[in-house]
Amino acid sequence: MKRLSLAMVTLLACAGAQAASEKVEMNLVTAQGVGQSIGTVVIDETEGGLKFTPHLKALPPGEHGFHIHANGSCQPAIKDGKAVAAEAAGGHLDPQNTGKHEGPEGQGHLGDLPVLVVNNDGIASEPVTAPRLKSLDEVKDKALMIHVGGDNMSDQPKPLGGGGMRYACGVIK
């Protein structure tokens, strides 16, 4: 009986030690609305920060800006009198109101993630880690965004790393 009890305690302890994980469905976005799925990104809590593992297809090859945005919506919204893709997601997650784009290692936006790398076949599968984000609770009900073009992790020479328009989006539940 003692062995059975010890086995149950060990099993429960191991189950409780399992890190949290969330799968985010990613969809193309346009000024008209949310489009087709291009795959998923799995977010895992790790000792080194939140790890984002993409399982994505149909993306333009190269580097893309990759961010957590403040609002949990991928819908278009009006900006300067025009409908803009996924504008309802708001800006980069910045709970400290730093107003700075300094990348995942810097002290600016908390939503700044490492760039997403897409191979020549349009597939993204390389995980990236955001060391300043420790818990899924920090990103719950926020939007995960892929931008057209790269990100130099600076506000110079262009604001927000020079990334382009919003290309794909998913809501973190």
UniProtKB/Swiss-Prot annotation:
Cleavable signal peptide: 1-19
A single GO BP: removal of superoxide radicals
Keywords: Antioxidant, Copper, Disulfide bond, Metal-binding, Oxidoreductase, Periplasm, Signal, Zinc
Annotated compartments: Periplasm
Amino-acid positions noted as binding Cu cation in the UniProt annotation, renumbered to this chain: 67, 69, 92, 147
Catalysed reactions, semicolon-separated: 2 superoxide + 2 H(+) = H2O2 + O2
Cofactor: Cu cation; Zn(2+)
Cofactor remark from the record: Binds 1 copper ion per subunit.
A Pfam match: Sod_Cu
InterPro entries attached to this UniProt entry: SOD-like_Cu/Zn_dom_sf (IPR036423), SOD_Cu/Zn_/chaperone (IPR024134), SOD_Cu/Zn_BS (IPR018152), SOD_Cu_Zn_dom (IPR001424)
GO annotations of cellular component type: periplasmic space
Binding locations of Zn(2+): 92, 101, 109, 112
Disulfide bonds: 74-169
Assigned protein family: Belongs to the Cu-Zn superoxide dismutase family.
Function per UniProt: Destroys radicals which are normally produced within the cells and which are toxic to biological systems.
Subunit text: Monomer.
The protein, known as: Superoxide dismutase [Cu-Zn] 2
Native source organism of the sequence: Salmonella typhimurium (strain LT2 / SGSC1412 / ATCC 700720)
Phylogenetic placement of the source organism: Bacteria, Pseudomonadati, Pseudomonadota, Gammaproteobacteria, Enterobacterales
Gene name for this UniProt entry: sodC
